[in-house]
Amino acid sequence: MSSASTKPRSANGVSQPQNWVGFKEVLSEEAFRRMISLERKRSERTQRPFALLLIDAGCSQLCDKQGRVWLDILSALQGAIRETDVTGWYTTNSVVGVVFTEIVLDNNPVLSTILSRIRALLRDGLDADQFSRIKFSFLVFPDDWDSQNPERPSNPTLYPDIEKRQESNRLGRATKRLIDVLGSLSLLAILSPVFFIVAAAIKLTSRGPVLFRQKRIGEHGTPFTFLKFRSMYINNDSSEHKEYVRQLIAGQAEKKSANGNGESVFKLTNDLRITPLGRILRRLSLDELPQLINVLRGEMSLVGPRPPIRYEVEAYEVWHRLRLLEAKPGITGLWQVSGRSRVKFDDMVRLDLQYARNWSLWLDIIILLRTPAAVLFGEGAH
């Protein structure tokens, strides 16, 4: 790139064009992405939103030929944004961004005015072809996550720290996937007699299909069809469970415990929807076996966070969403072997995040080895 190329990153993470004099500092890609991550974490903690504007110049070739393009873009930003806003490279020499801190979302005229002014300045400063190539993206956290549509995949743009961590561990993720495929195929073959016996028992003891299918929310908010052996009567009412899940996530379940002893559990006890055979299947976790098919399909892993139901995600707090981004859902996980259903919801999410951020093949092996004991002797299964 000619006049718009950047100098090497300085010690404070600031990049500036070589002929840029008197302009507001522009953070380097590394520093700006770190800024986005810190601002998001602040928003998760305080519930105060922020906004991110990204401007893509269209193609690097255009910028190489027209070195003024980036200077015009940065000049427009300099003339429009507030003193408290932060400018930086989201992708060096390709996408520039602005973090708008301390915003008020309800009919906020300030942001609308800023965006309109930036567009107007660029339209006046660039020729029509250059302006037509520019793409604008505007994201608001946490409102960018539509709570009424939890099946919409999340936007990784606001989570550069997670994206970086996953990119740096591609080999580990590929190895984990290989183990999932080989493990699920082996277990499906070995346990095929158990599948047949359980399926026959379900058909003989209650009306309805052998398999229970339910829409669950997977990695990055992607929905998938979750499989279990049916343990409930058909045509049951889920309203009580929906309300209990809402109370549990809100931290109110201890006041009105499902098991009557003051402990909060994730699953309802004395649930009249469950068949007598279903209670046995759940106690031994045999109802979970069809999830090996989900693992083979790549929708789940042998080890990972529990995949949530849609109405559960609708009740999530902002920081709870991280469990959908950090790891693929699994059949068993750290929280399951740390108390199973009796772990409080916030603690369950913390254990899921702890697992994802400290993941290793050895940790997966430990969890898999501890799972049979948790199934046989744990008191939390229902």
Language model features: what each stretch is:
Residues 40-45, 74-105:
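Conserved helix-loop-beta segment at the catalytic/binding core of cyclic-nucleotide signaling proteins
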Residues 1-40, 157-170:
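PAS-family sensory modules
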Residues 212-272, 332-348:
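Short, glycine-rich, amphipathic interfacial segments at transmembrane boundaries or analogous
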Residues 15-40, 44-54, 58-78, 108, ...:
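Conserved long alpha-helical elements within nucleotide-processing catalytic cores of c-di-GMP signaling
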Residues 168-243, 361, 366-382:
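A hydrophobic, helix-centered structural microdomain
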Residues 265-268, 282-382:
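Hydrophobic structural segments characteristic of membrane proteins
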Residues 1, 34, 46, 102-189:
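N-terminal hydrophobic signal-anchor/signal peptide
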